[in-house]
Amino acid sequence: MSSTTALHTKHLEAGAKMVDFFGWDMPINYGSQIEEHHAVRQDAGMFDVSHMTIVDVKGAQAKAYLQYLLANDVAKLKDKGKALYSGMLNEEGGVVDDLIVYHFDETNYRLVVNSATREKDMNWLMSKAEGFDVTITERPEFAMIAVQGPNAKEKAATLFSAAQKEAVAGMKPFFGVQAEDLFIATTGYTGEAGYEIMVPAEQAESFWQALLDAGVKPCGLGARDTLRLEAGMNLYGQDMDETVSPLAANMGWTITWEPAERDFVGRKALEAQREAGTDKLVGLVMTEKGVLRHGLKVKTESGEGVITSGTFSPTLGHSIAMARVPRDVGETVEVEMRKKWVTVKVVKPSFVRNGKSVL
């Protein structure tokens, strides 16, 4: 029996094509994945992300616990509501999951972790909490809706009360604020501006309907994947997992090495990997016909690699991919497509931001 979100009925009403997503019955699209993709790049789209796991970490040692748990350092978070992105690593330096953490104060934080890894993550959070004065509470009573695109904030704001409008006024990217019954964050997984909004589950349907009435287009997991790949954002389980170092997943920027005395889970292994050198995650661009896909082999001058994520980019009109390759890769590589080797260009793993190509 698959799990459903508080918005399941709304998806069916809208004629969504539903698929099983790690035990959740979720919309893959509502008719046209390409149209949904363009709506987010050009106007405003919304995603049901209620399957994500919301976890509150509170207690006298909440900060110390998260400093030990995460490769990125929550000590950087000084302002109320400021968020950061981090990997949660195992002792071998592999990625248990990637997540966002919001800082309310040094005794109160909120994490948003992936749904596919929920059980594993909860067990990991609990096991690492031993010896720390913290309580870890999952918050399934919230639904979560991501409203993304150049007009997303403006359209979402038509639903906000005066106090909520005031709370988000001038809010910079990567912040979250509790404003009356909504938790509103300037985060997302598309490379566009917008909000991720946590709403009490019993209000989710009416909130979704009000967004529809404001002209926000519902979008499924299909468009979510092409948007995040254009933005060069990793998908857990594909671009990295427990066997992959963040250094080999374009996540080096999420590791806080200083102060050297901060011990975090996986630090020793990471230091050895940094010393020895690892593979790296790069972007690939192919302007010929055909689509680069996950799992395709990549040949470079310094050895073999593999495509971790690949798709047709609706914004650019050709195929893009992310690939893990030896670190001294050249400007081009070869990819095996339909039994022949095709030369493709190597770029930084980011293709589109705020509706524009960054290639």
UniProtKB/Swiss-Prot annotation:
Keywords: Aminotransferase, Transferase. Transmembrane segments: none annotated. The glycine cleavage system is composed of four proteins: P, T, L and H. Belongs to the GcvT family. The glycine cleavage system catalyzes the degradation of glycine. Pfam families: GCV_T (PF01571), GCV_T_C (PF08669). It catalyses: N(6)-[(R)-S(8)-aminomethyldihydrolipoyl]-L-lysyl-[protein] + (6S)-5,6,7,8-tetrahydrofolate = N(6)-[(R)-dihydrolipoyl]-L-lysyl-[protein] + (6R)-5,10-methylene-5,6,7,8-tetrahydrofolate + NH4(+). InterPro entries: GCS_T (IPR006223), GCS_T_bac (IPR022903), GCST_C (IPR013977), GCV_T_N (IPR006222), GcvT/YgfZ/DmdA (IPR028896), GcvT/YgfZ_C (IPR029043), TrmE/GcvT_dom1 (IPR027266). One of its GO terms (biological process) is glycine decarboxylation via glycine cleavage system. It comes from the Bacteria. This is Aminomethyltransferase. GO terms for molecular function: aminomethyltransferase activity; transaminase activity. The keyword Nucleus does not apply. The keyword Transit peptide does not apply. HAMAP family: GcvT (MF_00259). GO terms for cellular component: cytosol; glycine cleavage complex. Its EC number is 2.1.2.10.
